[in-house]
């Protein structure tokens, strides 16, 4: 699962017994060599889908981590690209990724639930971060994103279809979430990371309540399941003009 340059089991255990912020500070130097980093195939598929509605002027990578989404935004944005995350360690790694050419790039340490921006962006993207938010936090999070988008701006992120019940993937995610719930019941500070808490129906409903118009776009690069449904979709939430 992890390469020789990735974190050891001991390092992962220390991270898991820390807060989310401290845990990612510790993991940051080796994060890109773990399966937690968003795969390049997902980043490329999202960039290709968004190119059809671009270009954009200013983009924001929400919960940017080590900056994997930077390549997506620099392909799409002409003016500036901003990454925001509350882990100083992850931002430190991200700063080393800035290309020599392209739009202006800035990194901001802040909590996604209290973004320090006005309506300054035409595009907000996020990759693999929503498991760190409890369902009750989604309304506030989406309201924050709505507030930093200009009229007509888009909030886009990929969503993979959940594993079928009784498959190995289903039991793995169910077991992971169960372990995290036990850990958080017994240990402080909590480490919020739940793979099964981000349900597409609930997400769409909360986005619409926050004032977005929501569209689901299949990502054809990942094919379809036996029932014909897409294996991966991109959620595009647009702030009305």
Language-model-detected regions and their locations in the chain:
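A short glycine-rich, Lys/Arg-flanked "PGG" loop and its adjoining helix->strand segment in the class I
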Residues: 139-151
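Conserved class I S-adenosyl-L-methionine
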Residues: 1-54, 72, 156-180
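Acceptor-substrate binding/catalytic loop of class I
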Residues: 186-200
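Class I SAM-dependent methyltransferase SAM/SAH-binding core
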Residues: 60, 66-114
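Conserved S-adenosyl-L-methionine
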Residues: 212-223
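A conserved beta-strand element that flanks and buttresses the S-adenosyl-L-methionine
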Residues: 125
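Core SAM-dependent methyltransferase catalytic element
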Residues: 223-241
